[in-house]
From Swiss-Prot:
Residues annotated as binding Ca(2+) 3: D95, D97, N99, Y101, E106
Protein name as it appears in the record: Calmodulin
Species assigned in the record: Schizosaccharomyces pombe (strain 972 / ATCC 24843)
Gene it is expressed from: cam1
Biological processes annotated in GO: ascospore formation; ascospore-type prospore-specific spindle pole body remodeling; microtubule cytoskeleton organization; mitotic spindle assembly; protein localization to meiotic spindle pole body; spindle pole body organization
Ligand binding (Ca(2+) 1): D22, D24, D26, N28, E33
Something else known: This protein has four functional calcium-binding sites.
């Protein structure tokens, strides 16, 4: 998502949020201002982490975030959230009984309905490959890791 895809309403909300971060109202968010807001939200980032967050979007290299850079950051975060929702929806397709795990049977059922003809052993191999904790099923974190690595 780019800043062009943001609605006027979203931009207005982000301007309001920006002014909360920009405590001295100089049009820029410093690492100190970012730290104050994050600590008020229960986070405890280090000075280096705060600077890294700023550097990620600091297009002009001045060490602070202006409103345009802030919009870029928020648009990226929204895109990440959209991707997360898509992965959750995909997980639900596989997790037929909704118990939070994908079993060999559930994976076989979905693959068969998609026209894939795999043996139980091939499906079990797929589960084993994704099953990092070795419990014989795929939980959401394991599923997300496999999907995100593609």
């Amino acid at each position: 998502m780019t800043t062009r895809n943001l609605t006027d309403e979203q931009i207005a909300e982000f301007r309001e949020a920006f002014s909360l971060f920009d405590r001295d109202q100089d049009g820029n968010i410093t690492s100190n201002e970012l730290g104050v807001v994050m600590r008020s939200l229960g986070q405890s980032p280090t000075a280096a982490e705060l600077q890294d967050m700023i550097n990620e979007v600091d297009a002009d290299g001045n060490g602070t975030i202006d409103f345009t850079e802030f919009l870029t950051m928020m648009a990226r975060k929204m895109k990440d959230t959209d991707n997360e929702e898509e992965v959750r929806e995909a997980f639900k397709v596989f997790d037929k009984d909704g118990n939070g795990y994908i079993t060999v049977e559930e994976l076989t059922h979905v693959l068969t309905s998609l026209g894939e003809r795999l043996s139980q052993e091939e499906v079990a191999d797929m589960i084993r490959e994704a099953d990092t904790d070795g419990d014989g099923v795929i939980n959401y974190e394991e599923f997300s890791r496999v999907i995100s690595s593609k």
